[in-house]
Amino acid sequence: MGIKDFRPLTPVQRFTSLDDFSDITKTEPEWDLTEPYKKKGGRNNYGRITARHRGGGHKQRYRIIDFKRDKTGIFATVEAIEYDPLRTARIALLRYDDQEKRYIIAPQELKVGSRVVSGPDAPPEVGNSLPLKNIPSGLPIYNIELVPGKGGQLVRSAGSSARMMGLDKEYAIVKLPSGEIRKVCAECYATVGQVSNPDHFNKSLGKAGRTRWLGWRPRVRGVAMNPVDHPNGGGQGKSKGGGGWQQLESPWGKPAKGKKTRHKRKNSTKFIIERRPKKKKKK
C-alpha cells in the first residue's frame, strides 16, 4: 500500500494525497459476510446527539469481522485482501479447510495464499491468533482481548501494534501504542503482527467534500459559539466567555488541554502499571 500524490491541475489536487489501493486484491465484498449498515447521524435511541459532527456520507455495508478467532486448530488460506469502508485497516478474507469463510483484520505482512491458524498450539507467526501466555516477549501484537472469549478490543486501527513484554503470574504485561503499560489476563487471545495500512495517517483529503463523503460534518470552534452553546463561548472579540483567562473546556464542562479527567477509583486502574506519557508542548 502506498500514497498517491496528484498533479496540481486544480487547487484541490495540489493538497490531495490518497491511497493508491495497490494492496487490494478484490473489489467486491463477500456478500454473505456483510449486512446493512444504518447510519444514526450521531443520535442515540432518544434521538439526541451523543456523537457530534456526524451525518450524511456514502451508503455502506458492514463487513462482519471475526474478532474472536474461535475456530481453533483449523488452518485457513488467505483468499483476498479487501477494503473496508467502515475501518481504517484492510481486512483479509479467509477460507478454512472446512470451506467456511470469515473476515479478519489483516496484518501488515499477510499475503494472498498465506496460511493462518488460531489456538493455543498455533505458532507465533504473523496472522496467527493465540493466548498471550504463549506469545514470546518482544513480538508485535494486535486485536487484543480484555476478557477471555469476548473478542479483540484493543489495537485494531491502521498501522497500530502493541508489544508483548512478559508474564506476571496469571497476567501478561503489554505495552500499548499510546505508551501505556498494563496487565491483561494471560488467557486472552491476541493476533501476531502489526495492523495493515500504516500509511493511512499520511493521507490528505484535500477538500471538505471528501470529509463529508466519510460521514463527518463541519466542526465549529467553541470560542466561536455563544455562552449558551459552549463553556468557551462569548466574550469580546476572540476571548473566551467570562472576560479574562478561562480554562479550556469540553462542551460538557470537562477541563481540556492536559488536566486529568479519569475517575480516581476506576476499577481497571489496578491493571495499569505505567500511564501513557504526556504529549510534549509545541514551542
UniProtKB/Swiss-Prot annotation:
Q: Where is the composition biased (Basic residues)?
A: 256-268
Single Gene Ontology BP term?
Answer: cytoplasmic translation
**Is Ribosomal protein found in the keyword set?**
yes
> Taxonomy-wise, where does this protein's organism fall, top ranks first?
Bacteria, Pseudomonadati, Verrucomicrobiota, Methylacidiphilae, Methylacidiphilales
Q: Which family does it belong to?
A: Belongs to the universal ribosomal protein uL2 family.
Its source organism is Methylacidiphilum infernorum (isolate V4)
* Subunit record text: Part of the 50S ribosomal subunit. Forms a bridge to the 30S subunit in the 70S ribosome.
Protein name, entry field:
Large ribosomal subunit protein uL2
Q: Which PANTHER family match?
A: LARGE RIBOSOMAL SUBUNIT PROTEIN UL2M (PTHR13691:SF5), RIBOSOMAL PROTEIN L2 (PTHR13691)
Q: Locate the compositionally biased regions of type Gly residues.
A: 232-245
Instruction: Provide the function of this protein.
Output: One of the primary rRNA binding proteins. Required for association of the 30S and 50S subunits to form the 70S ribosome, for tRNA binding and peptide bond formation. It has been suggested to have peptidyltransferase activity; this is somewhat controversial. Makes several contacts with the 16S rRNA in the 70S ribosome.
Q: Which gene encodes it?
A: rplB
Instruction: Give a GO cellular-component term.
Output: large ribosomal subunit
GO molecular function terms listed in the Swiss-Prot or TrEMBL record = rRNA binding; structural constituent of ribosome; transferase activity
Query: Which Pfam family, giving just one, matches this sequence?
Result: Ribosomal_L2
Sorted keywords for this record are: Ribonucleoprotein, Ribosomal protein, RNA-binding, rRNA-binding
Q: Where is this region: Disordered?
A: 34-53, 224-283
